[in-house]
């Protein structure tokens, strides 16, 4: 059931309820990066992980599997977090690696990669004069950032993206917070990535439970995929109804939740 973000119970205020759901199961903790682990900033290159958040991830990774799944390139988010113990997934889960040789099989054809390259070149040429617009060419996607674009120019940005989507039928549109994406038109998203990871780690619903924390509309696929057998926590709001079951206010709230979660897990589930 989808709800407004304001209707969700606060994850820290209802922490004991979350721990009851987890029970004796081993959690798989999965987090988005931008807007969840690091505040959203006008320049995506300046989204930095705080020392406190990094310490929380280090502590948790010692006792449970921890993954970061981002729309960024995997190498980018891996460099920003810079912790060897974690599992990293870029391009909404298309590119994933982790400890002990964990790696997701390649799912994107050379044909699609060629289309992404051509579309990126076209968009960079078309939008180079739009002040504040950033065309970010990634390994498996193109992100067009318009957060800093003047309101009267936003439509021009959107039209350019639509034009490329019409030109390249093997690409599809993705949306986020002040971002438009062109990505492979294949049946893959964060929800499928979470399910794949859960199985790849030899976890099952009887002994394990996924806990996903994210802030963006792209995280809804993950929330929806674990609604019955996991816990979804929405950070802030993305303006649409959500399949998440709990909420946190912001990245600071995420940090407080992770610290409380670690202390509880370390104490073998005793509150």
Could you tell me what each predicted segment is?
Residues 10-25, 75-81:
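Short amphipathic alpha-helices and their capping/turn segments at secondary-structure boundaries
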Residues 2-4, 36-44, 209:
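Short, basic, glycine/proline-bearing loop/turn elements
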Residues 47-138:
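Active-site phosphate-binding/coordination module
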Residues 22-43, 68, 194:
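Asp-based phosphoryl-transfer active-site loop
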Residues 24-26, 63, 85, 139, ...:
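A general structural motif
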Residues 130, 136-213, 217-226, 230, ...:
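Conserved acidic, metal-coordinating active-site core of Asp-based
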Residues 1-11, 24, 191-271:
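Mg2+-dependent phosphoryl-transfer enzymes with acidic/Ser/Thr/Gly-rich catalytic loops
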Residues 28-30, 87, 211:
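Hydrophobic "anchor" residues on beta-strands that sit immediately upstream
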């Amino acid at each position: 059931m989808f709800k407004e973000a304001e209707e969700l119970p606060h994850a820290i205020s209802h922490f004991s309820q979350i721990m009851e759901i987890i029970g004796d199961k081993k959690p798989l903790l999965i987090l988005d990066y931008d807007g969840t682990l690091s505040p959203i900033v006008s320049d995506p290159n300046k989204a930095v992980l705080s020392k406190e958040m990094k310490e929380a991830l280090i502590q948790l990774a010692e006792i449970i599997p921890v993954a970061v799944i981002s729309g960024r390139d995997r190498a980018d988010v891996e460099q920003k977090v810079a912790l060897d113990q974690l599992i990293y997934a870029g391009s909404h889960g298309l590119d994933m690696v982790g400890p002990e040789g964990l790696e997701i099989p390649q799912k994107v054809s050379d044909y699609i990669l060629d289309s992404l390259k051509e579309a990126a070149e076209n968009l960079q040429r078309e939008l180079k004069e739009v002040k504040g617009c950033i065309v970010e060419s990634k390994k498996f996607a193109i992100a067009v950032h318009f957060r800093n674009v003047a309101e009267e120019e936003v439509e021009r940005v959107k039209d350019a993206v639509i034009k490329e989507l019409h030109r390249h039928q093997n690409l599809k549109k993705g949306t986020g917070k002040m971002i438009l994406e062109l990505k492979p038109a294949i049946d893959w998203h964060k929800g499928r990535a979470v399910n794949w990871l859960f199985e790849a780690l030899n976890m099952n619903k009887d002994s394990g439970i996924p806990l996903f924390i994210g802030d963006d509309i792209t995280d809804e696929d993950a929330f929806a995929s674990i609604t019955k057998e996991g816990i979804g926590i929405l950070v802030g709001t993305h303006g649409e109804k959500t399949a998440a079951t709990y909420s946190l206010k912001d990245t600071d709230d995420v940090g407080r939740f992770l610290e409380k979660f670690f202390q509880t897990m370390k104490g073998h589930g005793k509150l």
